[in-house]
Amino acid sequence: MNHNEIIKYPLLTEKSYKTMAQNVYVFAVDRRARKIEIKDAIEFIFEVKVEKINLFNVPQKEKKVGRFKGLTNSYKKAYVYLREGKINIFPEEIEKEQKVEKQLIKEKSTSELKLEEKIAAKIAAKEQSEIKDEIVKSVPKKVTSIKKEITSKEVTPIKKTTSVKKETSPKEITSVKKTTTKEKDKTLVVAKKATIDTKVKSTTTKKTTTKKV
């Protein structure tokens, strides 16, 4: 028999809803079906693993529709005990579960992406800081070496300029002025002495001439 012909429909009653919590489901099955066929059909359609199946025959019953009377079809009631998996009888519940699963997957993917972005940003920041530290450590050495070269080249001209400044300092100028004034005074004194000597000689010559007369 075909799998779709074996299982007709699920039986939904208060008892069946209670048994669903215990992973036991009730189905209306073709009266010609056997337990092995029912087990194969349920495992194939719902993708679950069946532990055991209990069958009960449901005979025909009288049914009145308006003025007419008739009989219902006879069938078998199958109590299916599942070992693994669950059977979603209502398609709306399946769609809801699928939507919830998709939302959870999206949330997980977004959260994972955010975490990956944060980790990548932290790693990039660490790498940049390490590169900056290496640059900062290498730059002062180069600067100090350049400074040393510059100072070694420019030391001698700086000393020469200072010597020139010392020669032209105002203190030395005043000392030079003082020496020149002293020399002038000395020359004046010598000149005065010479004039005095000439005068004395002239007076002595005059006196000698007068005595001879």
UniProtKB/Swiss-Prot annotation:
GO terms for molecular function: rRNA binding; structural constituent of ribosome. InterPro entries: Nucleotide-bd_a/b_plait_sf (IPR012677), Ribosomal_uL23-like (IPR013025), Ribosomal_uL23/eL15/eS24_sf (IPR012678). It comes from the Bacteria. GO terms for cellular component: ribonucleoprotein complex; ribosome. It holds the Pfam family Ribosomal_L23. GO terms for biological process: translation. Residues 1-117 are annotated as: Large ribosomal subunit protein uL23. Residues 118-213 are annotated as: Unknown. Keywords: Ribonucleoprotein, Ribosomal protein, RNA-binding, rRNA-binding. Belongs to the universal ribosomal protein uL23 family. Part of the 50S ribosomal subunit. Contacts protein L29, and trigger factor when it is bound to the ribosome. HAMAP family: Ribosomal_uL23_B. One of the early assembly proteins it binds 23S rRNA. One of the proteins that surrounds the polypeptide exit tunnel on the outside of the ribosome. Forms the main docking site for trigger factor binding to the ribosome. This is Large ribosomal subunit protein uL23. It comes from Mycoplasma mobile (strain ATCC 43663 / 163K / NCTC 11711) (Mesomycoplasma mobile). The lineage of its organism: Bacteria, Bacillati, Mycoplasmatota, Mycoplasmoidales, Metamycoplasmataceae. The gene is rplW.
